[in-house]
């Protein structure tokens, strides 16, 4: 993976994905030992779209490894306002840094960036397409909660049309197999056909589409909640009509398994009641920590810096 861009997780083998999860676990228990892994390295965070968690997570990951960060947060701060192309920006920034994290509202922007850059580019989310590092955070959370990322019934609820984290997670779980997906959404926000096709192409994965969360929550090992994304709507009336379709509260949680894990890519609006935060099944703030850890693992890997004392996955057993 040294020197390699990560636009989607499809470019990584399942063993490479598992090794990144393994590295993240190691980093969590060896914070002091890895604190100088990336001394002298510089990360550029090029965020053409607003972000809080993802940008800060990428930046904190490099800082905790001993590196430094430059970048911008918002297209209005970039030379795009002067008409500069993504390709030219990346060719320029490649002269300054060792690795780039890019977020952009247009699908395919990360691929364009990776082709133009002479350093590794990590996709921090492009349009409604892919969000590979969020998926790594999701997988790390499943691994820590269940000790595996297969043999699970995973419910995905809310905006399944525009939710890039949903698409990315489904497609990656299909590569490991043995997952039953329960797709919970209003008709207006159903899962895109290309994602359904991916499930259908996997022999040991299956799905059902439903509109009612309460009727299926008791069957779920994982409930992945998403917000209805106002920024994806052209008509505010449509957004307001769909915004409150699914709200997870303690009353609904009474119908769920005691071992179920509630995930959410954040930010939330009102789709998870605040009183759920204290429920032991709430795993979304664990996802935040895991997101930083997997980004530390990924950043150090693509620039070729080895974690002191780390034993590669092939010498240890990790269950998919």
UniProtKB/Swiss-Prot annotation:
Pfam name, any one: OTCace
Residue numbers binding L-aspartate: 82, 164, 227
- PROSITE patterns assigned to the protein according to its UniProt record, in alphabetical order: CARBAMOYLTRANSFERASE
What biological processes does GO assign it? 'de novo' pyrimidine nucleobase biosynthetic process; 'de novo' UMP biosynthetic process; amino acid metabolic process
Which molecular-function annotations from GO does this UniProt entry contain?
amino acid binding; aspartate carbamoyltransferase activity
The UniProt catalytic activity note for this protein reads: carbamoyl phosphate + L-aspartate = N-carbamoyl-L-aspartate + phosphate + H(+)
Q: Keywords in alphabetical order, please.
A: Pyrimidine biosynthesis, Transferase
Q: What is its EC number?
A: 2.1.3.2
Give residues annotated as binding carbamoyl phosphate.
Answer: 53-54, 103, 131, 134, 266-267
Pathway assignment reads: Pyrimidine metabolism; UMP biosynthesis via de novo pathway; (S)-dihydroorotate from bicarbonate: step 2/3
Q: Which family does it belong to?
A: Belongs to the aspartate/ornithine carbamoyltransferase superfamily. ATCase family.
Its function, per the record, reads: Catalyzes the condensation of carbamoyl phosphate and aspartate to form carbamoyl aspartate and inorganic phosphate, the committed step in the de novo pyrimidine nucleotide biosynthesis pathway.
Q: How does it assemble?
A: Heterododecamer (2C3:3R2) of six catalytic PyrB chains organized as two trimers (C3), and six regulatory PyrI chains organized as three dimers (R2).
What NCBIfam families does the entry give? asp_carb_tr (TIGR00670), PRK00856.1 (NF002032)
Q: What is the name of this protein?
A: Aspartate carbamoyltransferase catalytic subunit
């Amino acid at each position: 993976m040294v020197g390699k861009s990560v636009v989607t997780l499809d470019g990584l083998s399942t063993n490479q994905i598992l090794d990144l999860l393994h590295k993240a676990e190691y980093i969590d228990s060896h914070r002091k030992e890895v604190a100088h892994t990336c001394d002298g390295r510089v990360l550029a965070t090029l965020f053409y779209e607003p972000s809080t968690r993802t940008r800060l997570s990428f930046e904190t990951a490099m800082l905790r490894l001993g590196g430094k960060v430059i970048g911008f947060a918002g297209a209005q701060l970039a030379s795009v306002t002067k008409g500069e192309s993504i390709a030219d920006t990346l060719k320029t920034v490649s002269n300054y840094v060792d690795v780039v994290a890019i977020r952009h509202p247009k699908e395919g922007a990360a691929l364009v960036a990776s082709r133009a850059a002479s350093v590794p580019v990590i996709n921090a989310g492009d349009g409604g397409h892919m969000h590979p590092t969020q998926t790594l955070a999701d997988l790390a959370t499943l691994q820590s909660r269940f000790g595996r990322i297969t043999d699970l019934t995973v419910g995905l609820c809310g905006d399944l049309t525009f939710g890039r984290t949903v698409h990315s997670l489904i497609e990656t779980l299909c590569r490991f197999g043995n997952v039953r997906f329960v797709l919970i959404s209003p008709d207006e926000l159903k899962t895109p056909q290309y994602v359904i096709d991916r499930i259908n192409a996997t022999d040991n994965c299956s799905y059902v589409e439903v509109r009612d969360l309460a009727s299926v929550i008791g069957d779920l090992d994982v409930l992945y909640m998403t917000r209805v994304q106002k920024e994806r709507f052209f008509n505010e009336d449509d957004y307001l009509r769909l915004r409150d379709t699914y709200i997870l509260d303690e009353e609904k949680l009474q119908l769920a398994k005691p071992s179920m894990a509630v995930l959410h890519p954040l930010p939330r609006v009102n789709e998870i009641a605040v009183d759920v935060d204290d429920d032991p099944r709430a795993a979304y703030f664990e996802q935040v920590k895991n997101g930083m850890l997997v980004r530390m693992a990924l950043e150090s890997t693509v620039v070729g810096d080895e974690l002191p004392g780390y034993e590669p996955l092939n010498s240890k057993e990790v269950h998919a």
